[in-house]
C-alpha cells in the first residue's frame, strides 16, 4: 500500500487570473507534466532523450554502490521506439540496467517501479495528445512522480559537464532486458483493487483504449473479472492513438453502450491514466461526477480521511456543494494531477482527482489510474445494486459550466493582460457568489483556457467569449 505523509495543505483556491505557476522559475525542459513536444523536434529529440537517460541514471545512483535499475514504458506512438532506444542507451551508458515493459499504461510503470524496487521509472507518452507529439515522465522509486527539485537537478545535469566526466567503460557499461510479464503483473495489480467478494460475471462493459497503452491490459482486466467485454480502440498502428477515440471522444463508447445494452462504458486516454465513463443511458460521467460518487460512498462508510477530497480549480462548483451537504470538504490545487497528489500526500488524504478524469486512489495507487478508477465505480454499482445513471445523478447537481480554449502564438503573463483582467473583474462582480471564473494558460499546449460557471448557461457562454476576445486584444497589442 502506498504511503502518504500528513501535513496540512489547506490553502485558498487561486484567483481567476492568479493561478500559481507551478513550473519552477528558470526551467526550460520540464513542464507541468514532464517533457513534452513534437517528436523529433526540439526538445523532444533522440539527442535530448539520450542525455536525459544519462541524467536520470546519474541522479538515481546517488548514495548507491549497486547497479541502478530503471523501468521504461511507453504508449503506442510511432516515435516511442526512437525515444525508448535513446533513453535506454543513456541509462546503459551510465552503467544502469534497463527493464523495458513495452506498451503499457503510465500507472503501470509507476506500479512496476515500486513493486520491482527499481530506482526510477520512465514513461514515454504524450497522454491525450495526437500521435505527432510525445513526452517523457519520470517516477521515483516510491512510484510517485518526481518532485520539482529532482527535475531541476536533472535539467541542471543535462546542461553541465558532469555527465561527460562520469562515463563508464568495459564491464561497467549497463544492459537492457525486456520485461515479458509486465502486462500480466499490472493486470493482477488492477484486479486486486476490486473486492474479492464481488464479481462482474455477465456484466456488459464497453472499454475504449484509444488505440493506446491499455489496448491489451484493459480488456484483460475486466474479462478476467467475469465481465462481458466489448473492446474499442485496441488496434494501434503508431499513428491512430487518441484519434477520434478514447476519453476525448466518449461518443463512440456511448453509441456502443446503447447498441449492446451495456451497464457502463469506460473511455481511457492514450496512456490510460485518466478515464471518462458513460452510463447505461448513454450519459457521460466525467471526473467530477466520479469523484462525487466515490467520495460520498467513502464518507458513508467512514473511509475518507478527514472527510476531504483534493481536486483542482477546474472542478465544478457542484462537486464542492455535494460534499459540503454531507459534511465533506474539498481542497483545491492548481491544474495537474501531480499537484493533486502532492496535496493529498501532504495532507494525509486518500482520494482526489480532476474533472478531466485523472482519479487518484492513494490506498491503491500512486498516480491517476483509469482502470483502477473504473473498478472502484463498478464495485460501488455492485455493492449498492444500482445503475450508474442513478448513482451519478444523485451524487451531485452540476452548476452550468462553460470551457473555452483559444490558441495564441504569444504567451503573455496573465498579470500583464490588462484588458483581460478588467473584463474578468467586471464579470466576477456580476456573478457574485453564484459563479466562478478561471483563466489560465495550459501547461502542455499553447492555449489559453477560460472556465466560467454560473446559473445560466447562455449567459456564462457569452462571458467566456468576452474574456477570450479581451485576451486576443491584449496579445495583439503586445505584438504591435
UniProtKB/Swiss-Prot annotation:
It is an enzyme of class 5 (isomerase). GO terms for biological process: carbohydrate metabolic process; peptidoglycan biosynthetic process; UDP-N-acetylglucosamine biosynthetic process. Binds 1 Mg(2+) ion per subunit. Activated by phosphorylation. InterPro entries: A-D-PHexomutase_a/b/a-I (IPR005844), A-D-PHexomutase_a/b/a-I/II/III (IPR016055), A-D-PHexomutase_a/b/a-II (IPR005845), A-D-PHexomutase_a/b/a-III (IPR005846), A-D-PHexomutase_C (IPR005843), A-D-PHexomutase_C_sf (IPR036900), A-D-PHexomutase_CS (IPR016066), Alpha-D-phosphohexomutase_SF (IPR005841). Keywords: Isomerase, Magnesium, Metal-binding, Phosphoprotein. Mg(2+) binds at residues 127, 269, 271, 273. It comes from Sorangium cellulosum (strain So ce56). PANTHER family: PHOSPHOGLUCOMUTASE (ALPHA-D-GLUCOSE-1,6-BISPHOSPHATE-DEPENDENT), PHOSPHOHEXOSE MUTASE. This is Phosphoglucosamine mutase. One of its GO terms (cellular component) is cytosol. The modification Phosphoserine is found at residue 127. Its cofactor is Mg(2+). GO terms for molecular function: magnesium ion binding; phosphoglucosamine mutase activity; phosphomannomutase activity. It comes from the Bacteria. The lineage of its organism: Bacteria, Pseudomonadati, Myxococcota, Polyangia, Polyangiales. The active site is at 127 (phosphoserine intermediate). Catalyzes the conversion of glucosamine-6-phosphate to glucosamine-1-phosphate. Coiled coil: none annotated. Residues 1-41 are annotated as: Disordered. Its EC number is 5.4.2.10. It catalyses: alpha-D-glucosamine 1-phosphate = D-glucosamine 6-phosphate. Belongs to the phosphohexose mutase family.
Amino acid at each position: 500500500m502506498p504511503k502518504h505523509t500528513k501535513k496540512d495543505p489547506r490553502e485558498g483556491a487561486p484567483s481567476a487570473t492568479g493561478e500559481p505557476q507551478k513550473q519552477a522559475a528558470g526551467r526550460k525542459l520540464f513542464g507541468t507534466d514532464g517533457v513534452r513536444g513534437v517528436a523529433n523536434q526540439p526538445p523532444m529529440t533522440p539527442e535530448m532523450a539520450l542525455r536525459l537517460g544519462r541524467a536520470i541514471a546519474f541522479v538515481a545512483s546517488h548514495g548507491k554502490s549497486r547497479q541502478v535499475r530503471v523501468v521504461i514504458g511507453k504508449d503506442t506512438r510511432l516515435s516511442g521506439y526512437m525515444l525508448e532506444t535513446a533513453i535506454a542507451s543513456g541509462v546503459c551508458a551510465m552503467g544502469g540496467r534497463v527493464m523495458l515493459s513495452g506498451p503499457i499504461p503510465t500507472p503501470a510503470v509507476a506500479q512496476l517501479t515500486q513493486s520491482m524496487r527499481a530506482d526510477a521509472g520512465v514513461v514515454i507518452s504524450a497522454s491525450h495528445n495526437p500521435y505527432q507529439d510525445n513526452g517523457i515522465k519520470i517516477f521515483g522509486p516510491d512510484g510517485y512522480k518526481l518532485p520539482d527539485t529532482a527535475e531541476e537537478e536533472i535539467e541542471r545535469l543535462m546542461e553541465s559537464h558532469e555527465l561527460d566526466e562520469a562515463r563508464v567503460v568495459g564491464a561497467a557499461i549497463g544492459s537492457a532486458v525486456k520485461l515479458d510479464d509486465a502486462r500480466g503483473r499490472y493486470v493482477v495489480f488492477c484486479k486486486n483493487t476490486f473486492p474479492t467478494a464481488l464479481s462482474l460475471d455477465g456484466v456488459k462493459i464497453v472499454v475504449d483504449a484509444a488505440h493506446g497503452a491499455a489496448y491489451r491490459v484493459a480488456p484483460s482486466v475486466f474479462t478476467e473479472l467475469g465481465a462481458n467485454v466489448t473492446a474499442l480502440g485496441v488496434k494501434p498502428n503508431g499513428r491512430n492513438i487518441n484519434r477520434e477515440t478514447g476519453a476525448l471522444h466518449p461518443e463512440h463508447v456511448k453509441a456502443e453502450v446503447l447498441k449492446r445494452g451495456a451497464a457502463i462504458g469506460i473511455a481511457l486516454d492514450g496512456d490510460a491514466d485518466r478515464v471518462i465513463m458513460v452510463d447505461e443511458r448513454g450519459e457521460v460521467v466525467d471526473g467530477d461526477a466520479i469523484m462525487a460518487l466515490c467520495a460520498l460512498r467513502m464518507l458513508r462508510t467512514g473511509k475518507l480521511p478527514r472527510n476531504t477530497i483534493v481536486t483542482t480549480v477546474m472542478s465544478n462548483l457542484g462537486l464542492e456543494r455535494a460534499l459540503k451537504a454531507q459534511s465533506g470538504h474539498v481542497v483545491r490545487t492548481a491544474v495537474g494531477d501531480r499537484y493533486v497528489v502532492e496535496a493529498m500526500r501532504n495532507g494525509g488524504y486518500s482520494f482526489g482527482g480532476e474533472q478531466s478524469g485523472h482519479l487518484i486512489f492513494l490506498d491503491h495507487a500512486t498516480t491517476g489510474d483509469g482502470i483502477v478508477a473504473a473498478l472502484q465505480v463498478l464495485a460501488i454499482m455492485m455493492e449498492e445494486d444500482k445503475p450508474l445513471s442513478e448513482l451519478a445523478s444523485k451524487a451531485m447537481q452540476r452548476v452550468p459550466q462553460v470551457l473555452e480554449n483559444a490558441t495564441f502564438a504569444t504567451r503573455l503573463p496573465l498579470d500583464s493582460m490588462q484588458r483581460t483582467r478588467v473584463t474578468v473583474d467586471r464579470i466576477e462582480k456580476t456573478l457574485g457568489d453564484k459563479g466562478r471564473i478561471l483563466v489560465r494558460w495550459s501547461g502542455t499546449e499553447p492555449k489559453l483556457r477560460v472556465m466560467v460557471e454560473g446559473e445560466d448557461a447562455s449567459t456564462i457562454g457569452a462571458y467566456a467569449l468576452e474574456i477570450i476576445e479581451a485576451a486576443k486584444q491584449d496579445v495583439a497589442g503586445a505584438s504591435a
